[in-house]
Amino acid sequence: MPSIHASAVLVGARALLIRGPSGAGKSRLVLALLRQAERGFPAFVRLISDDRSLIEPHHGRLLVRPVPEIAGLIEVRGLGIRRLGYEPAAVIGCVVDLAAADGERLPAATRLRVEIEGISLPRLPVAADADALGLIWGSLATDGAG
């Protein structure tokens, strides 16, 4: 099972796989999603993995799991590594690419899909200066007009 540099969070019934370079805000975005859920957003949110994730194709879907050695751990800037409840596995429903060079106001439809391990998934390319949390909630709450 390949290990990739990414965090993952369960939102509702599907996982968001959050990719990006070091310092892009993967852990911060996971914590922001958890905080939104505490404020009553109508979706269950729970950590799956932080910083490293295991991915595995399974019956045409892509599963994500935490790396066992760091399961339930998350970096909180200014506090260090902290422990948090987590989900042991989930189906990836969307890939969020932070600090994406192709993050645009009106992206082409081809940029809104990505293939990982032979499986095509929805993708949110988030520019370095964009509101990642707003884009995620916008994608969850709306349908494409295409």
Q: Residue spans of the language-model regions?
A:
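Short acidic/polar mixed-charge low-complexity motifs
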Residues: 14-16, 70, 119
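Conserved nucleotide-sensing/catalytic segment adjacent to the nucleotide-binding pocket
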Residues: 38-97
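Glycine-rich phosphate-binding P-loop
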Residues: 14-39
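Extreme N-terminal, non-catalytic leader segments
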Residues: 1-19
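Conserved NTP phosphate-binding and transfer environment spanning the P-loop NTPase/kinase superfamily
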Residues: 88-146
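Short, conserved beta-strand segments within well-ordered enzyme catalytic domains
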Residues: 17, 46-48, 125
